[in-house]
Regions:
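Conserved acetyl-CoA-binding loop-helix of GNAT-fold acetyltransferases
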Residues: 79, 85-98, 119-123
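Terminal substrate-recognition subdomain of acyl/acetyltransferases
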Residues: 1-4, 141-163
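A short, internal acetyl-CoA/4′-phosphopantetheine-binding micro-motif in the GNAT/acyltransferase core
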Residues: 77-84, 110-113
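Conserved beta-strand in the GNAT
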Residues: 52, 58-66, 71-78
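Short glycine/proline-centered loop/turn elements that form peptide/ligand docking sites
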Residues: 89, 93, 114-117, 134-139
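Conserved catalytic-core motifs of GNAT/GCN5-like acyltransferases
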Residues: 107-109, 122, 127-143, 163
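A short beta-loop-alpha structural element at the N-terminal edge
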Residues: 7-22
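Conserved GNAT acetyl-CoA-binding A-motif
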Residues: 93, 100-112
Length: 163
């Protein structure tokens, strides 16, 4: 696996032409990827909180949040394997945080076996709050992680370029 550090990273809302690339990334990154129909629905319902990261014209990452009545829910985040460990996921989360109401709960679920992701989220200030048994279609448990969005400016996005 190649690790690429990217000093400037264009992050922008998903566009109609991005859905196929997001679906390809879903299939590459997840055992049980979301369907193209579901990705399209997410894009329509969350147009301002479905962000994509682009490197040299290629979509290399995305993150999407649903705004709920009492919390923000990270539905999915993915980075192409060749672009991991370069700060893309951290920058996507930071860019999302800037768009979300401060002082609210930010929640996600992650596979219990996905220890690198759990460590990443811990590093972003998330704490494990509970386990949901049999959450995933293959029967694997999910770890629920949460944190409050800071009322002051969030994670550093100085090296992000939002379009």
């Amino acid at each position: 696996m190649t690790t690429v550090a990217i000093p400037k990273l264009p992050i922008r809302p998903i566009g109609p032409g991005d859905v196929d690339a997001v679906c390809s990334l879903e299939r590459l990154c997840f055992k049980d990827p979301y369907s193209p129909h579901f990705i399209s629905q997410l894009a329509q319902a969350n147009s301002d909180t479905f962000l994509v990261a682009v490197v040299n014209g290629d979509l290399v990452g995305y993150a999407v949040v649903n705004r709920g009545s009492n919390h923000n829910h990270l539905v999915s985040i993915a980075v192409h394997p060749n672009n991991r460990r370069g700060g893309i996921a951290r920058r996507l989360l930071a860019a999302l945080e800037e768009r979300l109401e401060k002082g609210r709960l930010f929640r996600l679920e992650v596979r219990k076996s996905n220890l690198p992701a759990i460590e990443f989220y811990r590093g972003q200030g998330f704490q494990e709050t509970r386990v949901i048994e049999g959450y995933y279609s293959d029967g694997e448990d999910a770890v629920v992680m949460e944190r409050n969005l800071r009322k002051e400016p969030g994670l550093s996005t100085q090296s992000c370029t939002q379009v």
